[in-house]
Each structure stands twice: as structure tokens, then as C-alpha cells.
């Protein structure tokens, strides 16, 4: 196996720390060709679709991509902004705000973002961080709840990249933060702010992205972590069990997924006499196709056509101040022990050590 070419090693330089915020991904444009490229990468991941590769290849290449790409492109076009894909726009802004927040707290930390599928890709950003001298990297998935279909796939991408690197940086990974106090508090503030403006609903629906039910029986903790998030948020909102419901959306294919499904549940609520619902998607930290189009357009239509009168979608955390603060606290927790905050005296001491190392290396014949 061949290895990637390493940048020249520089003596006397201080190692840097970086946080890599990773989201799912998005097409580069709301066009059939761009969506086809994106779906091909996404649905080719064995973490996402656990079907024998040969069988799945024919299904993907001959059925799904030819017929689904155009339909999905129209949906992306409905939510595309002048800045681009909402998911990419929000994730990029979160990374910039997190940089500022950590810097204001005294951390010397660089924050970059990447997409598991699409661009900027995980390998692309990891190469960039290496070229800039980052020797400590915290991988922070944008998924509060862990799943082998999402979080683990990010870890796979990182491991796969470094399997061909000679000089591997120190790595840390955030597995989940579904029950982190600051994350729950950010959700609470978002919901309360909406209620202050629009009033309370008859029912709060917490809709999480679905996964095949078999993943639960095979040991994936995602279902349990979603319910724990919902329970903790309901407690902070002083909701009783009959005032909220947990559902799962975005079912793909014919296999059974985690239930209850979001759209049928909303239809059932409307037919049972529930007039107003608020829908929140706690597992999505950035608004995207699944929230803006699936929930904001399709599920809204289903609820109203079934007899409901008032449907409100509560936006994702996006660039919410409380969420950026939560991200910072989660990152700080996982960077404990890394020298990201140095006093002037300690910084000067480290710089002096670096100068001594450089001088000694040059004495031994090093060029840089």
C-alpha cells in the first residue's frame, strides 16, 4: 500500500489544535446531476445501507439513481437559498461562530467544517489541517445522538484517511451529546422563544431521523438516545407525557423503520381532533432538506389535509447563541488536557523550547 506524500517536517514549530465539525452532506447544486453524484456517494456507504453489495449495486445504479435524482433535485430547489444549500450554509456559520466563541474564552483552536458526503470532504479538510500544522484534532459530529449509520461513518472516513498517512495526528472523537445539559438547554430556549411569540400548541411533536428497525435489535443505541433527549427536553419544558410525542421521519425503502412514523402520526393527530401542533427536529442541528422540505412542506400539508388547523415548524438550532455555547462546552470537555489555553509566561516557555529544538536539529544537519 502506498502512503500519501507528507509535507516537510518543520523543526521548532508549536503543534496546533483543531476542531473538525462534520455534518452529513449535501449536493453542490439543486440539479439532477449534482444530486445523482451526492446520492451515489451517500447510498454507497455500507453503514447507510446494509444490503449485500452486489445486489445493492444493481438497485442503486439501475433503479434509485435514475428515478430518484430528478425528484430529489426539485425538492432541493424548493429550499435552496442565495447562499447555497441550507445545511452547508448553517454548518459553515456554526464553525465560524465556534471559532470566535472558543477564542473569546482564551483557546488557541482552529475550527473547520466538513461533510461526510459531498464537499468539503473529510479527507480534503484533514489534508488542509495537516498542511497548516495541526497535530491535535477533535472530530465533532453534528449528530447529538449516536448511530452506526451516521456517527460511525464519520469515524470510518477519518480512519480510512489516516490509514494512508505516515504522520498521524493525535485524534479525539465526540461520540454523542444527546443528554448534554447545554444541548438540552439550547433546545429548551428555542422552543420557549417560539412559544413566547406564537403561543403553545395542543401537542409538541419531536421528530427524529429514522433508521431501519433492525439496527436497534442489532445493538444500535440511536432509538434509546433519541427518547432520552426527548424526555430530558420535555422535563425542561414541564411537559406531561400526553403533551408531546416522539416520531421518526425520512423512511427510505420498504423495510420497517423505527416507529411511530412522523407523517402518519400527524395525520392521526389531526383526525383525532388535535388542531394545533408544533414540530421540532432535535436530532438535526442545522436546517436541511429533511426539515425545511419534508417537515415544513410535506408533513405540514398532510396535517392540514387531515383536518388540522395550525402547523408550526420550530427551526433547528442553526446559529442560535445557546447552541454555539453548547458546542463550545462540548468541545472544551473533550479537549481537556490539550494545551489550548496558555498564559503569556507558559507560551514564552514553549516558544523558547521550540527555538532550542530548532537549533539542535540544525546542528545535526536538518534544513528546516
Curated annotation (Swiss-Prot):
Involved pathway(s) = Porphyrin-containing compound metabolism; protoheme biosynthesis; protoheme from protoporphyrin-IX: step 1/1
Q: What is its main location?
A: cytoplasm
Top-rank EC class of the record's enzyme: lyase
Q: Where is it localised?
A: Cytoplasm
Keyword entries, A-Z: Cytoplasm, Heme biosynthesis, Iron, Lyase, Metal-binding, Porphyrin biosynthesis
List the protein's name: Ferrochelatase
- Indicate the family of this protein: Belongs to the ferrochelatase family.
Free-text function comment from the UniProt entry: Catalyzes the ferrous insertion into protoporphyrin IX.
Its recorded reaction(s) are: heme b + 2 H(+) = protoporphyrin IX + Fe(2+)
GO MF annotation terms: ferrochelatase activity; metal ion binding
Q: Which InterPro entries match?
A: Ferrochelatase, Ferrochelatase_AS, Ferrochelatase_C, Ferrochelatase_N
**Organism from which the protein derives:** Herminiimonas arsenicoxydans
- Kindly list the biological process annotations in GO that this record carries: heme biosynthetic process
Amino acid at each position: 500500500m502506498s502512503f500519501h506524500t507528507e509535507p516537510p517536517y518543520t523543526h521548532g514549530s508549536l503543534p496546533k489544535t483543531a476542531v473538525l465539525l462534520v455534518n452529513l452532506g449535501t449536493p453542490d447544486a439543486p440539479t439532477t446531476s449534482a444530486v445523482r453524484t451526492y446520492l451515489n456517494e451517500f447510498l454507497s456507504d455500507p453503514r447507510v445501507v446494509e444490503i449485500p453489495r452486489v445486489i445493492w449495486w444493481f438497485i442503486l445504479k439501475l433503479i434509485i439513481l435514475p428515478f430518484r435524482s430528478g425528484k430529489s433535485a426539485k425538492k432541493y430547489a424548493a429550499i435552496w437559498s442565495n447562499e447555497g444549500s441550507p445545511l452547508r450554509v448553517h454548518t459553515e456559520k456554526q464553525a465560524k461562530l465556534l471559532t470566535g466563541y472558543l477564542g473569546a474564552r482564551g483557546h488557541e483552536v482552529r475550527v473547520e467544517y466538513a461533510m461526510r458526503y459531498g464537499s468539503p470532504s473529510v479527507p480534503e479538510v484533514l489534508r488542509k489541517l495537516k498542511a497548516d500544522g495541526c497535530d491535535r484534532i477533535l472530530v465533532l459530529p453534528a449528530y447529538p445522538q449516536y448511530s452506526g449509520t451516521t456517527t460511525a461513518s464519520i469515524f470510518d472516513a477519518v480512519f480510512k484517511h489516516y490509514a494512508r498517512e505516515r504522520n498521524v495526528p493525535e485524534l479525539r472523537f465526540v461520540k454523542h451529546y444527546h443528554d448534554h445539559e447545554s444541548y438540552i438547554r439550547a433546545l429548551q430556549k428555542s422552543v420557549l422563544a417560539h412559544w413566547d411569540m406564537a403561543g403553545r400548541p395542543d401537542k409538541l411533536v419531536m421528530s427524529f431521523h429514522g433508521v431501519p428497525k433492525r439496527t436497534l435489535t442489532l445493538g444500535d443505541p440511536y432509538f434509546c438516545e433519541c427518547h432520552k433527549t426527548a424526555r430530558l427536553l420535555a422535563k425542561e419544558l414541564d411537559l406531561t407525557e400526553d403533551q408531546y410525542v416522539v416520531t421518526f421521519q425520512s423512511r427510505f425503502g420498504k423495510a420497517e423503520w423505527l416507529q411511530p412514523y412522523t407523517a402518519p402520526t400527524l395525520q392521526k393527530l389531526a383526525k383525532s381532533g388535535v388542531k394545533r401542533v408544533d414540530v421540532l427536529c432535535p436530532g438535526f442541528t442545522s436546517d436541511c432538506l429533511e426539515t425545511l422540505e419534508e417537515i415544513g412542506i410535506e408533513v405540514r400539508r398532510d396535517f392540514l389535509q387531515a383536518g388540522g388547523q395550525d402547523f408550526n415548524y420550530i427551526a433547528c438550532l442553526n446559529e442560535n447563541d445557546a447552541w454555539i455555547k453548547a458546542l463550545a462546552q462540548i468541545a472544551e470537555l473533550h479537549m481537556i488536557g490539550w494545551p489550548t489555553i496558555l498564559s503569556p509566561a507558559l507560551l514564552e516557555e514553549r516558544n523558547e523550547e521550540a527555538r532550542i529544538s530548532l537549533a539542535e536539529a540544525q546542528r545535526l544537519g536538518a534544513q528546516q
